[in-house]
Each structure stands twice: as structure tokens, then as C-alpha cells.
Amino acid sequence: MAYTANSASSELIAGPTLSTLSSAEGNGAAFVTPEKSESGVKPARKLPNITNSGPLLDRWGRVATDLRISLTDKCNLRCIYCMPADGLQWLPKENLLSAEEIARLADIAITELGVEEIRFTGGEPLVRADLVDIISRIHQAHPDVPLAITTNGIGLEKRAAALAEAGLTRINVSLDTICRETFAALARRDKLDAVLKGIDGAAEAGLWPIKINAVLMPGLNDDQAPELLHWALAGGYQLRFIEQMPLDADNRWTREGTITAAEIREKLSAEYV
């Protein structure tokens, strides 16, 4: 799995099962490769010293300063644009990076590669019981580096205060609708109340600004964009409509089945222009 600058956003992306980090010759990019073992026995993991430190550049010459670390592949929702209804076969726990390994990866990225901000994703990062420990380790070593998570918000109500105290700076919450029925249809779980309580908990913990990421799907929730925007404005949240990516395990994604930015603006302009 490559650890490189994202061509769209100039950020670095690391997956949950990465074991080695080295500097790619010639272009300053760093790559992380999965572990391999002919016997099937997991070898001892080591992150070698970076021999060529310095900023990471993508093919367009942009410097990547953000690192996104996927902490797990597990998720407690089954969003129709992301995962099949029956879920997936999760990675064995022993194959995931430990809190210590994640902290070391972050330290290398910050001290050797010029990373200035770290975001934790998944799967769903809140399913990691050691998330507070991960945040705390990195924050204690690098207190000036912003730390953020992208989450569905389930369970955040109970953990927001501890995460903020550990050093978490801000959150992005994935929320496509505030209609309970639509949420249940999209996420295949009736968990809207838990998400909204999680957002309230984050606000009470001082995790500002709270950013909301929403995916609009034609015929499902695209007509609810104005309602979602009104709710976000009332709460003081930053709302961003993001592109539906071809990540669904059912491989049913088509560009014709997505909604464009122009179409979103048209739906919003009727009420807000």
C-alpha cells in the first residue's frame, strides 16, 4: 500500500497494516509496504530510519504536509456507497498497527518528512479502544501539531472529552442527512440520534470547528441538501458536500449515478441566494 501525496489534496495516506517506511529514490516520496511472510507467521515489525529526509512532493511538485492514518478497516455502519450490507472480512487485530507503532510513524512523518498535521480515519477510528492513547502519545511528543479525526460520530458523546484532553484538535463528522428514515436507509443502521449526540458532545468538549462531510445521492438524499445546510448553519458547523467515490464493495458505482457540484448549487440557490 503506497504512502504518497494524494493528487487531489496533497496529503499523505497510510493504512492500518503498514510495516515499513522508506524514502523513494529520486522524487522524495515515501512509500509504505505491507508485511509479507511465506510461512504466514507475522514477522517482527520495524520502521527503519529514513535515509533521505525532507518534504514529500507529488508528481506535480506539490509539498504534502498532511498525513492521514487509517487506524482500522472496521466500521459500525454499513453505508450503501461504502460497504455491503453483510459487512466485510475484517483484518485480524494482530495485523493492525499498535498505538506505539502509529506514534512512531507519526514521529517520523513530522520530524523527517515535514508533516504538519495528522488526521485519523478508518473504517471508523472510534472503534479503536486505544484511540485516546494514540492521540496522547503523538500530542505529548508534538504538542503543536494539529490532530483530527474523521468519524461517523457514534460513541463520540462518551469519548469527546477524553479525546480533547488527550490532545485532539478537531473533528470531521460524516453525516449525509438529518432525516432519520433516510439515514437508516443510507447507513443501514438506525443511528442518527447517536450521531447527533456525538456532535453535541464534541461541541461541549470544545472540539471546534466541527466539520460535516456529506455525500449526496440522486433520488435518496439530494433533495435534503437545503435542510442539512440549514441545520449546519444553525449549529455553527462547517458543511462540505464531498464527491461520492467508487469505494463500494458491490462495485455498482457509476458517474451517472452521482450528483455534480452545479446540481448541488442549484438545489441550494432556491433557498439561500
PLM-predicted stretches and their roles:
Residues N221, A225, A234, Q238-V273:
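A C-terminal junction/extension of Radical SAM enzymes
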Residues M1-L57:
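Radical SAM enzyme core and accessory elements
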Residues D58, Y81, E181-A184, A214-P218, ...:
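Flexible, active-site-adjacent loop/turn segments at secondary-structure boundaries
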Residues A103-R119, R128-R240:
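Radical SAM/AdoMet-radical enzyme domain recognition
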